[in-house]
Regions:
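Long, low-complexity N-terminal extensions
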Residues: 1-159
Length: 159
């Protein structure tokens, strides 16, 4: 709620003064676009929330994944496909692996969506931006993940 009270007026000002239309706001019954997504820790407990133009808050802790923006539907679908890996039971490093894997897959399948992205590693001590070198190291681990999946699939008997 504190995030909502601080962020909503700033974003409303931004839209009122710089952007002619808030997506979804003018249409009756339309779902408004999310203004902002926030992730962090409160009293040692992780949270993921988004806030829409009407101030409504969506919570995603149980899912452990959320996306907003032009490619969000595809990113959320990719996140769903990774759900069987039980990412909410894994550490932050595994979350970074999954995020980079999803972002790279979207870049291949939908090159017109989005642009450069920043990846942050978030834990109770704070948020740290990953450098290009860090992301390259993560991509090496993602390649190994894909190799292990392929090997496991090869060992399964065919129908």
């Amino acid at each position: 709620r504190a995030v909502q009270e601080r962020v909503l007026p700033l974003l409303r000002y931004h839209y009122d003064n710089f952007i002619a239309q808030v997506p979804g706001e003018q249409q009756s019954g339309a779902t408004p676009a999310t203004y902002v997504m926030v992730a962090g820790y409160a009293n040692g407990t992780p949270f993921i929330v988004d806030i829409d133009p009407h101030g409504l808050i969506g919570r995603y802790e149980e899912v452990g994944f959320h996306a907003i923006g032009s490619g969000s539907a595809m990113a959320q679908q990719a996140g769903t496909l990774l759900a069987h890996f039980q990412m909410t039971d894994r550490d932050v490093d595994h979350g970074v692996l999954a995020a980079v894997r999803v972002l790279d897959a979207l870049r291949v399948t939908s090159p017109s969506i989005g642009g450069p992205v920043d990846v942050y590693r978030l834990n109770p001590e704070g948020a740290v931006a990953l450098s290009e070198e860090d992301i390259d190291r993560v991509r090496e681990r993602v390649r190994r993940w894909a190799e292990l999946e392929s090997e496991a699939l090869d060992r399964l008997p065919s129908a």
